[in-house]
Amino acid sequence: MTDDVSRETPSVPDVARRVFASDRLSLAERFVELLAGDGVVRGLIGPRETPRLWDRHLLNCALLAQQVPLEATVADLGSGAGLPGVVLAIARPDLRVTLVEPLLRRTTFLEEVVAELGLDRVEVLRARAEALHGDRRFAVVTSRALAPLDRLLGWSMPLVEPTGALLAMKGSAVAEEITAAGPELARWGCATPEVLSLGADLGLAPTVAVRVVWADPGRVSWPIAAPRKRGGQQRRAGHARGTSNRRRGT
């Protein structure tokens, strides 16, 4: 990974010192530098986003950390540039985070970031979410602007433990997404989603997320079969065929 850092790399805002612990803030700073440098060069972050890396990307992703249980296992689907997965690993060193991303150029960047930051509890997995169905389960499955909720359920819920949760970062249309996902929520046996608004206590623009859990955890078993659609065929979750690359720092 190069040391070429954009001149537009934003300075650390005061609120970041309230979001990240003192011994983790330097890692967050370095991640911002990597996003502003190689992240922009490789097309993972738009150049116009560079001045907003802290407030629009790192801080709002870090707010999600307060919703994750202690020492939880986390799968971040469609991790892309590591948002929110890498940020969660920085903010919460107690977590075990798996970054799930199908594109090689993105997983290469993620592997380099993980090594650079010494995040030894982070796994980079080049795969689609469906490739993990039937083989892996997590306490929390996260995503950020990956897909509408109705489609996201089919990728995420087969990975969620009986007492776990899907935790998806969403935008202002979250209520409409929940309404549209009503039939899928019922088919998968999910409880009514909970909408979270985070960051107001820090004076930040609200970060919106939706939490989805199983309606009856006691009835969840594996491998989870995709619920039958009317007039369709039932599909059973397959076994993982992704490539795992665990990178450890020095």
Curated annotation (Swiss-Prot):
- Biased region (Basic residues) positions are 227-250
Please give the organism.
Nocardioides sp. (strain ATCC BAA-499 / JS614)
Look up the record and report any one GO term of the cellular component aspect.
Answer: cytosol
Organism ancestry: Bacteria, Bacillati, Actinomycetota, Actinomycetes, Propionibacteriales
Q: Which SUPFAM superfamilies match?
A: S-adenosyl-L-methionine-dependent methyltransferases
Q: What is its EC number?
A: 2.1.1.-
GO terms assigned for molecular function: rRNA (guanine-N7-)-methyltransferase activity
Gene for this chain: rsmG
Protein name, per record: Ribosomal RNA small subunit methyltransferase G
What is this protein's function? Specifically methylates the N7 position of guanine in position 518 of 16S rRNA.
Keyword Transmembrane assigned? no
Where would you find this protein in the cell?
Cytoplasm
Region Disordered: which residues?
224-250
